A protein has these predicted regions:
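Glycine-rich beta-solenoid repeat tracts in large extracellular/virion proteins
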Residues: 42-48, 67-74, 92-99, 118-125, ...
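Outer-membrane beta-barrel pore domains and translocons
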Residues: 150, 203, 255, 308, ...
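N-terminal segments that cap or nucleate solenoid repeat domains
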Residues: 25-74, 89-90, 504-516, 702, ...
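Fold-core signature of tandem repeat domains
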Residues: 70, 79-81, 86-87, 94-96, ...
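Outer membrane beta-barrel transmembrane domains
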Residues: 786, 865, 874-986
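Outer-membrane translocation/initiation segment of Type V secreted surface proteins
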Residues: 2-4, 35-42, 497-506, 578-581, ...
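Outer membrane beta-barrel translocator domains of Type V secretion systems
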Residues: 63, 662-847, 963-965, 970-977, ...
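Extracellular beta-strand/loop-rich repeat segments of large surface/secreted proteins
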Residues: 441-443, 450-456, 462-620
């Protein structure tokens, strides 16, 4: 080659690699065993010695048309290329051969280029010490390998790069440890590594560990990172803390033929375009295999992750990012020789065109899968586990955030092992769950989303004689049967020996709604669990035994002809049976439980009345049919009411019936007590509003009267209804307030009074049924407003005739609360009015003239017409006030004396004790109807009353009065009342 041509080639290479300002001549000066190279040269720099320390400074430039750029041979070698240094060679840029026993150390900060070989090539003898190659910056490029080391010594190989490393036709970094070597370590802290074959290839035939750490981009047309441990090597560690690893076939390929563990840690993107993003194979001699993805995305043209452990060690895969298997599974894991498999998805998404996750355990180890992210399968399943060994156990835990589905419709498939699948709070499964030949358990736990479930199959073995037990635990709301094709909202429940609905720890939302028949050997409804019959079906059969400690509900739809048949035995463990019924007489209808086997234990019965009016029964309405030994007991869990009647659950022969009791409900008494109180609470008589005085207006001298009176009443009432079975007691309080607004006289002797009054009252009652022991409570609160008028024939002496009249408008809020029944609320209002007349005459006086004696016959007519609104109870009973007005007549005689003590002379003080007897007659008893059946208060038509009291004037302005009255009637009717009144005159 001519000198001109050589200059052109050099200039072209320098331009290509950015080296145009190289010095004119390279000179390697020697000082002892140290060489310092500066400037430019076109010849290979061959340096040989025992111990060599070679420094290529920042001005050095070596460019050769043939051979190496720098060739160093010796026993202990240190080569340093400073930043700015350049080597461009036809063969290897730097060729190092350690023929002795010392270490080989390279520190590269410049540019090394090989046009037909390796950028840097290191070969050692079998006795050589460790290799350390550190690239702090710059570029290392080779037509074959960017860096190649062949270490045959007995120590370690350590390669650390921070710049660009490139292998045009082979590997970016190709590192080999011979059989006597130990650890092989490659660390990338920046830059970029690329290779035509592999980005990084590490092969350890020695006895130590192999570790590769990357923080930036690594790529190769076959594998981004390729690691191979031979028979005597120990652990493999590949750790990606950032960046990307990309391979035309594999992103990371690790093959451990050694005797240690294999660990793959990724945080960035890993891509295997035509194969697997991560491919790991542990040979039989190796131990544990672990893959941890802490972020990023792993993509494979086949599988996202493929891990095969032939050893006895355990296999674990943990993911936090996205994993994609474009023509295979997102993650495929298999073992060959008995180790456990643990797969954990902390978050993220895993998808594959075959399975999202595919796990094959060929021996006796356990398989555990924990999912907290999205898993999407293709043609096979979302999660597919298989066991080919003996006594294998598989556990799949779907936790908060889990979302499992597949294009095939099979969300989870687990075959050939004892499998436990847990759908926990926040987990969702769409599609089928298919469990294989094993003792399998599926737990649908509280808070899981089963809305997308279509099939849950406990066993793919149809042999009824095998010893396999499959258990389905439902702690969630689920609808389905054993005879549906399976769809979201109507799940096919297949091949389960034991079905448990609810448990002691999870009692909310544990509901199985049957859309058809259900096959199981044993169905247990735990406390808090519920089994319903869907509104879409009328007749449902349960094939096995049933134990009920929760609720068996046939009454979710408003019809009363559902039938639930239990082919086996039924045992009640204080559970509840809920049925619909049209509560009538014997012609009434009801849902029915049919037990073809035996019954045992105790069951409570709840009845939903669907518009039944209530009637007396003879035989009753059948609700439970028992064809075997009827040792179990059934009893109502609360009140069963319709119209005027209570119903009970009674046994006749082997079967159970609803039968009405021949006694009215106690609520009758509460309605009656409220009706009576509404018409009597504000009833007044003349002497409830005593006296007044006159005063002279200071300005006009006109005589006027004004006053304010108030009375307080407390009373207690007792009565019985027409059946004699309902005993009612009530307590009342009344406060009335009034006063005269006008007073006048026509002849100076008589006196007319006109006044206004208002009041508040409360009455609380309790009714007890002697027939069944039930109670009911009534409560009425209300107000009144009205006026009164009085005429005295003799105002001064209050003798002769008098007439008193009043009229009130009354309104009340009413409540009736039956035992174990909802509170009923209704309104009442109406008019009460009275007309009273009597005659007062003196019968005598004391010797001293201080005391006079009076007799007063009287009669009062009172019209009572406070009516309650028609009311429909929560159970459908129509309640009507059946008393259309009542005229009460009171005929009585009052005897009293009037006087004062000598010490009260001149003090305007007088006292009037009295005794009064009355006969009271009502034209109607208070009456109420329930669904057309009438009941009334008895003993109140004719009542005798005795009243004792005293009326007194304390001074000219203040009057007080009080009395106690006792009324007695037939059939235990009685009323006791105390009154205290006060009046102040202005």
């Amino acid at each position: 080659m001519s000198r001109t041509t050589r200059k052109f080639v050099i200039a072209t290479v320098m331009s290509t690699f950015g080296l145009m300002n190289a010095p004119a001549e390279a000179v390697c000066s020697q000082e002892g065993n140290k060489y310092t190279c500066s400037g430019a040269d076109h010849d290979t720099q061959n340096l040989t010695g025992d111990v060599l320390d070679v420094v290529l400074d920042g001005t050095s430039y070596i460019n050769t048309d043939s051979g190496y750029g720098l060739s160093v041979t010796g026993s202990s070698l240190t080569i340093t290329q400073q930043e700015g240094g350049i080597i461009v060679a036809d063969a290897s840029g730097i060729n190092i051969e350690n023929t002795g026993t010392g270490d080989t150390t390279l520190n590269i900060s410049g540019t090394v280029v090989a046009k037909r070989a390796d950028g840097i090539e290191i070969i050692t003898s079998y006795e050589a010490g460790a290799i350390t190659l550190i690239q702090e910056a710059g570029t290392i490029s080779g037509e074959q390998n960017g860096i190649q080391t062949q270490y045959m010594g007995t120590a370690d190989t350590f390669i650390a790069v921070s710049g660009e490393v490139k292998g045009e036709s082979n590997n970016g970094i190709n590192a080999l440890n011979g059989s006597t070597a130990k650890n092989l370590s490659i660390m990338q802290s920046g830059g970029k590594i690329t290779g035509r074959f592999n980005g990084i290839q590490a092969s350890n035939q020695g006895t130590g560990n192999t570790s590769i750490i990357t923080t930036s981009d690594v790529s190769g047309e076959y594998a981004g990172v390729f690691v191979d441990n031979h028979a005597s090597a120990q652990d493999i560690l590949v750790m990606q803390s950032d960046g990307s690893i990309t391979g035309g076939h594999y992103g990371i390929y690790a093959f451990n033929h050694g005797i240690g563990d294999t660990t793959i840690l990724t945080a960035g993107n890993v891509t295997g375009t035509n194969g697997s993003g991560i491919y790991v194979d542990n040979a039989e001699s190796a131990n544990n295999l672990s893959i941890v993805q802490s972020g990023g995305k792993i993509t494979g043209g086949e599988h996202g992750i493929y891990a095969n452990n032939h050893s006895r060690g355990d296999t674990s895969v943990t993911t936090r990012g996205e994993i994609v298997g474009e023509n295979g599974s997102g993650v495929s894991v298999s073992t060959m020789d008995g180790g456990d498999i643990a797969f954990t998805q902390i978050q993220g998404k895993i998808s594959g065109t075959q399975s999202g996750i595919d796990i094959l355990n060929r021996e006796t180890g356990a398989t555990t899968v924990n999912i907290s992210g999205e898993v999407i399968g293709g043609s096979v399943a979302g999660i597919n586990t298989d066991f080919r060994g003996n006594d294998g156990k598989t556990t799949i835990n779907l936790n908060q955030g889990a979302d499992i589905s597949a294009a095939s419709g099979i969300a989870i498939r687990s075959t050939h092992s004892d499998a436990t699948v847990n759908l926990n709070n926040g987990a969702k499964v769409s599609g089928q769950i298919l469990l294989g030949n094993g003792n399998n358990t599926l737990n649908l736990n509280q808070g899981s989303d089963v809305s997308g479930l279509t099939v849950i199959n406990g066993n793919d073995d149809d042999d009824p004689e095998d010893s396999i037990t499959t258990t389905l635990n439902i702690n969630q709301s689920l609808t389905g049967s054993s005879f549906t094709e399976g769809a979201a909202g109507d799940v096919a429940i297949l091949n389960w020996n034991i079905i448990n609905v609810g448990n002691a720890a999870q009692t909310r939302n544990a509901t199985l709604t049957l859309s058809g028949d259900l096959n199981a050997d044993q169905i247990t409804i735990a406390s808090g669990g519920r089994v319903n019959v869907s509104s879409a079906v009328r007749d449902v059969t349960l094939a096995g035994k049933v134990n009920n400690a929760g609720s068996l509900d046939l009454g979710i739809e408003r019809n009363s002809d559902n039938r639930l048949t239990i082919e086996g035995d039924y045992s009640g463990d204080n559970g509840n049976l809920v049925l619909n019924s049209v509560l009538e007489g014997d012609n009434g209808t009801a849902d029915r439980l049919i037990v073809n086997g035996d019954t045992a234990g105790h069951t409570w019965v709840s009845i939903n009345n669907l518009g039944g009016q209530g009637a007396l029964t003879d035989k009753g309405i059948e609700i439970v049919t028992v064809k075997g030994d009827s040792a179990g007991t059934f009893a109502k869990s609360g009140r069963i009411v319709a119209g005027a009647y209570d119903y009970d659950v009674v046994k006749k022969d082997s079967n159970w019936f609803l039968a009405s009791e021949k006694a009215y409900r106690p609520e009758f008494g509460s309605y009656l007590a409220n009706a009576r109180a509404a018409n009597t609470l504000f009833h007044t008589r003349l002497h409830d509003r005593l006296g007044e005085t006159q005063y002279t207006d200071r300005l006009t001298g006109e005589q006027k009267v004004t006053s304010l009176w108030m009375r307080h009443i407390g009373g207690h009432n007792r009565f019985r209804d027409a059946s004699g079975k309902l005993h009612t007691q009530s307590n009342r309080y009344v406060m009335q307030l009034g006063g005269d607004i006008a007073q006048w006289s026509r002849n100076g002797l008589d006196r007319w009074h006109l006044g206004l009054m208002t009041g508040y009252a409360n009455n609380q009652s309790r009714t007890h049924s002697k027939a069944n022991g039930y109670t009911s409570r009534g409560d009425i609160n209300g107000y009144s407003v009205g006026l009164y008028g009085t005429w005295y024939a003799n105002q001064k002496e209050k003798t002769g005739a008098y007439v008193d009249a009043w009229m009130l408008y009354n309104w009340f809020d009413n409540q009736v609360t039956g035992q174990n029944l909802a509170t009923e609320k209704y309104h009442a209002d109406g008019i009460t009015a009275a007309l009273e007349t009597g005659y007062t005459f003196q019968t005598g006086e004391s010797r001293d003239g201080r005391t006079r004696y009076w007799l007063q016959p009287k009669i009062q007519l009172t019209w009572m017409d406070v009516q309650a609104d028609d009311h429909i109870e929560n159970n459908g009973t129509h309640v009507v006030n059946n008393t259309n007005g009542n005229l009460q007549t009171r005929l009585g005689m009052k005897f009293y004396q009037q006087g004062n003590h000598i010490s009260d002379e001149g003090k305007d003080r007088t006292f009037q004790p009295f005794i009064e007897a009355n006969w009271i007659h009502n034209t109607h008893n208070d009456s109420v109807m329930m669904n057309g059946i009438s009941n009334a208060i008895t003993g109140a038509r004719d009542v005798g009353e005795l009243k004792l009291g005293v009326e007194g004037q304390i001074n000219a302005r203040l009057q007080l009065w009080g009395n106690v009255a006792q009324q007695l009637g037939d059939n235990g009717f009685s009323d006791t009342q105390g009154t205290l009144g006060i009046k102040y005159q202005f």
